[in-house]
């Protein structure tokens, strides 16, 4: 009997290895086919930006992946500077703020933006203006994310409270858009700091329904597994949605498998998930939705062009994909309308298909999944493709 048991285990291992090799071979074949088609399409139909985006502008849209600091428009930055001229002079002496020409330029903007957002009033202006701009772009549901910071003027608790108050005020000032907050836990954070912030979120949940989720963000080259237990706690004890920045760069795939097995509600970017047989298998098996930011990926050079985006790869396989902006303030041509336009012409999406993507996005929003509020009216607008 023992020999039979060993024999069966060996057979099972061989079968598992064979299945793994088979999946790897199929992925490679699919990838080559996709790349061939993308190359052919690029040669005969390069991406051309049209001035007329009326159809996409007038479409009610859902945004699930937008960072507050990266969404500040030049107009918003100007308003923040004008609110504190002394501070503005200090910042302008230290930094030179220019329109970025590439991703290095984008990253160069963030120290300036973080310096600007050190006071409560600056946070209030930033949130109000960003929500206002998304509403003007006919976004009907927005999850905006930010990482609490401790500054000379605010504690982590102060930062969260200012955010909550700003979102509450926006509900009344901008009733056409449903707005919620995702709190970012940065990969660089000490575990104790991230745990402290999660505790503050728990306290805030007793007073408000503004906070609907937490995310893992920060430098994609860093391993984020030391914070994994906090995301388990966030879901189990706080009832929060979980979204994880994963597989943004090939240089760090170390933490991907562990976070996929956590079965997060959504994945941010996930640019290279399909390049590894096992992570491709897990993503497909669990059908974990992907928040895809086309312009951000092209601008950061993690994808060579729009057609080489992983958007269509996963869409063909039945994995939900959502059109998002990431950092509309610092990445040129990345408003939500422009992202919908680019997705439509790149992947030949019909109006009905775009409506379907919006429906899926709202179904996977944290406010819907965790019964935070009634979204009947928002669903009506999306289903009928109307704004009123």
Swiss-Prot record:
Residues 1-34 are annotated as: Disordered. Residues 14-34 have a biased composition (Basic and acidic residues). It catalyses: N(6)-methyl-AMP + H2O + H(+) = IMP + methylamine. The record marks 269 as: Important for catalytic activity. Residues 1-13 have a biased composition (Basic residues). Belongs to the metallo-dependent hydrolases superfamily. Adenosine and AMP deaminases family. Catalyzes the hydrolysis of the free cytosolic methylated adenosine nucleotide N(6)-methyl-AMP (N6-mAMP) to produce inositol monophosphate (IMP) and methylamine. Is required for the catabolism of cytosolic N6-mAMP, which is derived from the degradation of mRNA containing N6-methylated adenine (m6A). This is Adenosine deaminase-like protein. The lineage of its organism: Eukaryota, Metazoa, Ecdysozoa, Nematoda, Chromadorea. The gene is adal-1.
